[in-house]
Amino acid sequence: MKLIRPSFEILEQKPRAIVIPADMEIGPRMVREELLSSVYRQIEIAGRTCYKSEDKITDTSAKEFVERMVKSGHGAMLEHGTVYLLLNMASRQQYFKYCSNPYSVANSTGEAEKGTWLGFVTTNYRVLVENNWLDDLQYICEPGKEHEKRITVKFVCDRGVSHEFVRHRVFSF
């Protein structure tokens, strides 16, 4: 019998540092692409850990891995890709669909009447895929203090503990 030493590891989802020469500005498209890449990388880490294929992770494998998960309908892995959205007055109508989504958290500040309204949505990639809301990725942003923060944690435990752990719906992965 092999004894398992229980442990955990917090898997942070964060964009790679983009090195920008001092005389150059980074465009918003490049920022959005890197934020989306960080979502893909997080999904790949969760998926490859689950499938015991971590050795296949490369610098360029994440997007292809996520596309395969979407195509094959393996939505559980997509839940690990946290998406933070920032909505303004022009995109305000998008906000309300997240208010009624049980897997999203929507907060707002300011007042619509004064034109100072901002919406802060925390959701996951599975919500966007299953509801056909991928167009909303144009609003992707880094998490701000108004966003609900999410983390992914890798637990190492024995089989008996894992069966108890996943009996709760929020932990059924």
PLM feature spans:
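A conserved ligand/cofactor-binding region detector
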Residues: 1-173
